[in-house]
């Protein structure tokens, strides 16, 4: 039936053939969209990759590629991961079923636009029909970009990048299938529809946030995180913690505005909702029980396995709710790194690991947001293991939750705030200016944060514990 014919029939019938949605005077009146007079949203959506979890599942990915009918795969990793059991098992899985593949290993930790464009150029140079990412969030995000632009070779890089730097266009072609194999218990990128990159010229980060870039399959194998170095485990764990806390305390979906005119453009960062709450809260429970164990005893397989599970769960949570101030304020910190402040990471450039930059302002951020939704902050503190009564005051809730966060930082011996990473009070104006570009994050903070407030949050984060 043609669109014009359908419109003609509906016009003659009065719009709707359902008597339950039409007034008595006209049983064929088209029902209006629910709550059409409101400016805020009224619905939420669930977007997630298929997730496979279990020890040894990396060896199954060859069958997954074959089941897709793919003939030539691009395997993307970085030079450190290339020496791990995760990468070796991924290669073995492809060889077992005779899948033709090539390897791209020139991925930058904390990727930039330029480093992503190298991967994109390689992906475009040959007729790959599927992609596999083996690595942490930097590798997975880079692979998302490579697969997206290889599927849309005519697009300019900024076409799919979000505001304020990109055009936020919808791609003409769907992304070629991507299988993500995470090697850190951290970013949750294996389940999300976002890819983040650094913009050095703007001294901040930006991202691609499109439903079509979520991986076809997330293969989450605990064997792949058992060899994580101590600082990688700490900082990726901080990322999990903030993903869960930020998504659980985000502005509720039905308080977010504007309402989308078309459901196809409903933002990925849609605000906290009943589905994201389940995943975020369970991630917090796991973190409260296993985070310290996973750091202080790296041979504790149960703790490392559970933290990997928390990473994926928090990814599902924030992938459907969003993150707010911790992430929004983190991007200028890591983008403007003055030195390499962490062992266990490559030293080829100044580097502040993403998880550390996110955690640096967390205490100030949650002190600020507690009053906006004290019940959410109370539940967060309790779920992390704090003994706090349900009738606690806002001040007590804030202090208890933030003491938990300080405790992790102090116990793990990480740099103490912005000063511990080489920043001074004189840098706050520059950080604040760059943070103003983190529009999608700051927009779903449960409490509105203007430039003056952001500056204050940075100032309070100069020293944390």
Curated annotation (Swiss-Prot):
<dbReference type="GO" id="GO:0046872">
    <property type="term" value="F:metal ion binding"/>
</dbReference>
<dbReference type="Pfam" id="PF00465">
    <property type="entry name" value="Fe-ADH"/>
</dbReference>
<dbReference type="GO" id="GO:0019552">
    <property type="term" value="P:glutamate catabolic process via 2-hydroxyglutarate"/>
</dbReference>
<comment type="function">
    <text>Catalyzes the cofactor-independent reversible oxidation of gamma-hydroxybutyrate (GHB) to succinic semialdehyde (SSA) coupled to reduction of 2-ketoglutarate (2-KG) to D-2-hydroxyglutarate (D-2-HG). L-3-hydroxybutyrate (L-3-OHB) is also a substrate for HOT when using 2-KG as hydrogen acceptor, resulting in the formation of D-2-HG.</text>
</comment>
<dbReference type="GO" id="GO:0047988">
    <property type="term" value="F:hydroxyacid-oxoacid transhydrogenase activity"/>
</dbReference>
<keyword id="KW-0809">Transit peptide</keyword>
<protein>
    <recommendedName>
        <fullName>Hydroxyacid-oxoacid transhydrogenase, mitochondrial</fullName>
        <ecNumber>1.1.99.24</ecNumber>
    </recommendedName>
</protein>
<dbReference type="InterPro" id="IPR039697">
    <property type="entry name" value="Alcohol_dehydrogenase_Fe"/>
</dbReference>
<dbReference type="InterPro" id="IPR018211">
    <property type="entry name" value="ADH_Fe_CS"/>
</dbReference>
<keyword id="KW-0560">Oxidoreductase</keyword>
<dbReference type="InterPro" id="IPR056798">
    <property type="entry name" value="ADH_Fe_C"/>
</dbReference>
<dbReference type="Pfam" id="PF25137">
    <property type="entry name" value="ADH_Fe_C"/>
</dbReference>
<dbReference type="GO" id="GO:0005739">
    <property type="term" value="C:mitochondrion"/>
</dbReference>
<comment type="similarity">
    <text>Belongs to the iron-containing alcohol dehydrogenase family. Hydroxyacid-oxoacid transhydrogenase subfamily.</text>
</comment>
<dbReference type="GO" id="GO:0004022">
    <property type="term" value="F:alcohol dehydrogenase (NAD+) activity"/>
</dbReference>
<keyword id="KW-0496">Mitochondrion</keyword>
<dbReference type="InterPro" id="IPR042157">
    <property type="entry name" value="HOT"/>
</dbReference>
<dbReference type="InterPro" id="IPR001670">
    <property type="entry name" value="ADH_Fe/GldA"/>
</dbReference>
């Amino acid at each position: 039936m043609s669109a014009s014919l359908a419109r003609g029939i509906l016009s003659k019938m009065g719009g709707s053939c359902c008597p339950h949605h039409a007034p008595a005077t006209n049983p064929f009146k088209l029902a209006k969209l629910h709550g059409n007079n409101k400016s805020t949203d009224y619905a939420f959506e669930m977007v997630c990759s298929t997730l496979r979890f279990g020890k040894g599942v990396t060896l199954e990915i060859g069958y997954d590629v074959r089941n897709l009918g793919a003939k030539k795969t691009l395997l993307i990793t970085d030079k450190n991961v290339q020496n791990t059991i995760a990468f070796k098992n991924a290669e073995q899985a492809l060889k077992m079923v005779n899948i033709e593949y090539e390897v791209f290993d020139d991925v930058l930790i904390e990727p930039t636009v330029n480093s992503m464009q190298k991967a994109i150029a390689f992906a475009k140079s040959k007729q790959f029909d599927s992609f596999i990412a083996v690595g942490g969030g930097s590798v997975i995000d880079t692979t998302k970009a490579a697969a997206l632009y290889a599927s849309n070779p005519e697009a300019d890089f900024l076409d799919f990048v979000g505001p304020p730097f990109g055009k936020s266009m919808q791609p003409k072609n769907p992304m070629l299938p991507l299988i993500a194999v995470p090697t850190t218990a951290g970013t949750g990128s294996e389940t999300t529809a976002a890819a983040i990159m650094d913009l050095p010229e703007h001294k901040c980060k930006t991202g691609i946030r499109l439903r079509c870039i979520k991986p076809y399959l997330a293969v989450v194998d605990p064997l792949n995180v058992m060899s994580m170095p101590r600082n990688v485990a700490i900082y990726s764990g901080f990322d999990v913690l903030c993903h869960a806390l930020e998504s659980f305390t985000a502005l509720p979906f039905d308080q977010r505005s504007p309402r989308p005119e078309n459901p196809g453009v409903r933002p990925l960062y849609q605000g906290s909702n009943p589905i994201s709450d389940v995943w975020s809260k369970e991630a917090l429970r796991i973190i409260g029980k296993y985070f310290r164990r996973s750091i202080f005893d790296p041979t504790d397989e149960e703790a490392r396995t559970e933290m990997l599970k928390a990473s994926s769960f928090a990814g599902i949570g924030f992938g459907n709710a969003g993150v707010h101030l911790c992430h929004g304020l983190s991007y200028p910190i890591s983008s403007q790194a003055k030195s390499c402040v962490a062992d266990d990471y490559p030293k080829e450039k100044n580097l502040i690991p993403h998880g550390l930059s996110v955690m640096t302002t967390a205490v100030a951020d949650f002190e600020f947001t507690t009053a906006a939704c004290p019940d959410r902050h109370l539940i967060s503190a309790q779920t992390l293991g704090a003994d706090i009564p349900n009738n606690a005051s806002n001040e007590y809730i804030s202090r208890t939750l933030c003491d938990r966060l300080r405790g992790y930082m102090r116990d793990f011996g990480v740099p103490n705030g912005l000063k511990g990473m080489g920043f001074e009070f004189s840098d706050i104006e520059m950080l604040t200016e760059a943070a103003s570009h983190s529009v999608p994050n700051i927009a779903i903070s449960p409490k509105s944060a203007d430039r003056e407030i952001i500056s204050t949050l940075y100032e309070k984060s100069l020293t944390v514990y």
